[in-house]
From Swiss-Prot:
Family: Belongs to the ATPase alpha/beta chains family.
Organism: Cycas taitungensis
The gene coding this protein: atpA
Binding site for ATP: 170-177
Its biological purpose: Produces ATP from ADP in the presence of a proton gradient across the membrane. The alpha chain is a regulatory subunit.
UniProt KW Nucleus keyword: no
Protein name as annotated: ATP synthase subunit alpha, chloroplastic
Matching NCBIfam families: atpA, PRK13343.1
InterPro entries: ATP_synth_asu-like_sf, ATP_synth_asu_C, ATP_synth_asu_C_sf, ATP_synth_F1_a_nt-bd_dom, ATP_synth_F1_asu, ATPase_a/bsu_AS, ATPase_F1/V1/A1_a/bsu_N, ATPase_F1/V1/A1_a/bsu_N_sf
Length: 507
C-alpha cells in the first residue's frame, strides 16, 4: 500500500504556487457581420486603430480602414474564401510592415515582400512600415546630380536628377514601360539600386520585363515588386508603398535608388474599387475624395537627402496611362501637379515610327539643367528650341507650295535632328556617345547625308570614336565638360568618318 506523506504534498503545492504566474492578456475580438468582394464588415472591434492589421480565424489578414459607429470596414489581403459570417476576428495591435535587407536585390516579391520567384526565402533582420512618413524639409537638399537614362531625347532636353519625381505619361502601347526599363538597364555600374513595381499588369508582361533585366545583367541590382491583374485590390493598392519602403531602406543607408511605379492609374482604380465597396462617398470620375493624398504621400517619399543624412537619394518615375491623349483627366492632372515634370509619349509619334515617342514640345523637367553635366548643357542647349521651331515650320510647310532656301535648309536640319533622337529598345547610350551624336546633328554635319543614312552613320561614328579616339570619352568622363580639346577630337573624328562613310555608300 502506497503511503502518502503530507510534507511531500505540501512542498509540491508550494512549488506550484511559486511557479504560478498571474498574467492578464487583453485581446480585442470582433465578429464578422458580412464578407465579400475583398471587404469584411466586423462588429465588436471597439479599440481598433485606423490602418491596424486584423487577423481572421482562417489566418487571412486584413486592414481596418473604415471605423464607423457600429462596425469596422476592413479590406482583405487575400481571397478570404474561408471566412464566414459569425467567425471571430482579432485586432493585432500592429500596422502593415515588411522585412527589409540587402538580400532583396535580384528578387521578385509580392506586396507583402514575400518572394514569388521560386528561389527560396529571403533572410531579413530589419523591418520597415509600408507607410513611412516622407523626409521633412530640413532632411532634404536640392537635386544636383544627373540620373542618366541612356535615352538622348530625355538626357539632353528633359534631364532627370537623383531625388527627382518625373512622370512618364501616355496612352497604352506607346512605350512607357520601355522608357522605364531602359533607364534601369542604364544604371548598370552606376551604384544605383532599382525597384520596379508592377501594379495590375498581366503576369506575362511582368515575366517579359524580368527576362529583359536578366538578359541585360540588370537583375543583380533590381528588385521587382509584382501584383498582377488577378491579385486582390488591397494588394494592388499596397504594392507601390512596399516598393517605396524597400527603396527607402537603401536610401537611408546612403545609397542611390530608382523606383518605377508601373502604373499609378491601376493603383488608383484598385483604391477606387476598395473605397466604393467600403461605401465611401464617390467624387470626380467615381474616385474617392482622398485619391490625391493616395499619390502625394507616395511620391513625396522620393527625395535627395541632406549631407547630415548621408546624401542618399530616391528617384521616382511614376507611370500614368491616359485615354486618347487626355491629360486633363483626374489622375493625370493630380500626378502632374505632384511631380517635378513629365515625359509625354504620343501615340501619333509612335505610329509614325519615332521611338521613343517622346513629344519634346510638351514634356518638361522642372529641375532642368541642375541635373545635367556641363558638357551636355554646352552641346544640347539649343536643341529643344530648334526642334520646336522645326515642328512649327513643318506644320506650316504642308500648306506652302514654294519655300525659300533658308526654310528648306531648316526643315532638312530638323528632319535629321528628329532622326538622331530615334533609339532602339534596350540600347541605352553613354553620355559621351550622346554628346557626339547631338554635336554631329546640331552643327550640320548630317545635312549632306540622306535621312535614311543618318542612323547608320551615327552608329558607325560612335564605334569609330571608341576605337580611334578613346581620349574623347576619357575627357568627357573626367572633366564632365566639353573642352576645346574634346571638340577638336570630335570634329576630326566626324570629318574622317564622313569621308569613309560616303566612299562606302557610293560603292
Amino acid at each position: 500500500m502506497v503511503t502518502i506523506r503530507p510534507d511531500e504534498i505540501s512542498s509540491i503545492i508550494r512549488k506550484q504556487i511559486k511557479q504560478y504566474n498571474q498574467e492578464v492578456e487583453v485581446v480585442n475580438i470582433g465578429i464578422v457581420l458580412q464578407v465579400g468582394d475583398g471587404i469584411a464588415r466586423i462588429h465588436g472591434l471597439d479599440e481598433v486603430m485606423a490602418g491596424e492589421l486584423v487577423e481572421f480565424e482562417d489566418g487571412t489578414v486584413g486592414i481596418a480602414l473604415n471605423l464607423e459607429s457600429n462596425n469596422v470596414g476592413a479590406v482583405l489581403m487575400g481571397d478570404g474564401l474561408m471566412i464566414q459570417e459569425g467567425s471571430s476576428v482579432r485586432a493585432t495591435g500592429k500596422i502593415a510592415q515588411i522585412p527589409v535587407s540587402d538580400a532583396y536585390s535580384g528578387r521578385v516579391v509580392n506586396a507583402l515582400a514575400q518572394p514569388i520567384d521560386g528561389r527560396g526565402k529571403i533572410t531579413a533582420s530589419e523591418s520597415r512600415s509600408i507607410e513611412s512618413p516622407a523626409p521633412g524639409i530640413i532632411s532634404r537638399r536640392s537635386v544636383y546630380e544627373p540620373l542618366q537614362t541612356g535615352l538622348i531625347a530625355i538626357d539632353s532636353m528633359i534631364p532627370i536628377g537623383r531625388g527627382q519625381r518625373e512622370l512618364i505619361i501616355g496612352d497604352r502601347q506607346t512605350g512607357k514601360t520601355a522608357v522605364a526599363t531602359d533607364t534601369i538597364i542604364n544604371q548598370k555600374g552606376q551604384d544605383v539600386i532599382c525597384v520596379y513595381v508592377a501594379i495590375g499588369q498581366k503576369a506575362s508582361s511582368v515575366a517579359q520585363v524580368v527576362n529583359i533585366f536578366q538578359e541585360r545583367g540588370a537583375m543583380e541590382y533590381t528588385i521587382v515588386v509584382a501584383e498582377t491583374a488577378d491579385s486582390p485590390a488591397t494588394l494592388q493598392y499596397l504594392a507601390p508603398y512596399t516598393g517605396a519602403a524597400l527603396a527607402e531602406y537603401f536610401m537611408y543607408k546612403e545609397q542611390h535608388t530608382l523606383i518605377i511605379y508601373d502604373d499609378l492609374s491601376k493603383q488608383a482604380r484598385a483604391y477606387r474599387q476598395m473605397s466604393l465597396l467600403l461605401r465611401r462617398p464617390p467624387g470626380r470620375e467615381a474616385y474617392p475624395g482622398d485619391v490625391f493624398y493616395l499619390h502625394s504621400r507616395l511620391l513625396e517619399r522620393a527625395a535627395k537627402l541632406s549631407s547630415q543624412l548621408g546624401e542618399g537619394s530616391m528617384t521616382a518615375l511614376p507611370i500614368v496611362e491616359t485615354q486618347a491623349g487626355d491629360v486633363s483627366a483626374y489622375i493625370p492632372t493630380n500626378v502632374i501637379s505632384i511631380t517635378d515634370g513629365q515625359i509625354f509619349l504620343s501615340a501619333d509619334l509612335f505610329n509614325a515610327g519615332i521611338r521613343p515617342a517622346i513629344n519634346v514640345g510638351i514634356s518638361v523637367s522642372r529641375v532642368g539643367s541642375a541635373a545635367q553635366i556641363k558638357a551636355m548643357k554646352q552641346v544640347a542647349g539649343k536643341l529643344k528650341l530648334e526642334l520646336a521651331q522645326f515642328a512649327e515650320l513643318e506644320a506650316f510647310a504642308q500648306f506652302a507650295s514654294d519655300l525659300d532656301r533658308a526654310t528648306q535648309n531648316q526643315l532638312a536640319r530638323g528632319q535629321r535632328l528628329r532622326e538622331l533622337l530615334k533609339q532602339s529598345q534596350s540600347a541605352p547610350l553613354t553620355v559621351e556617345e550622346q554628346i557626339a551624336t547631338i554635336y554631329a546633328g546640331a552643327n550640320g554635319y548630317l545635312d549632306i547625308l540622306e535621312i535614311v543614312q543618318v542612323r547608320k552613320f551615327l552608329v558607325q561614328l560612335r564605334e569609330y570614336l571608341i576605337t580611334n579616339k578613346p581620349q574623347f570619352g576619357e575627357i568627357i568622363r573626367s572633366t564632365r565638360a566639353f573642352t576645346e580639346q574634346a571638340e577638336a577630337l570630335l570634329k576630326e573624328a566626324i570629318q574622317e568618318h564622313i569621308e569613309l562613310f560616303l566612299l562606302r555608300e557610293q560603292k
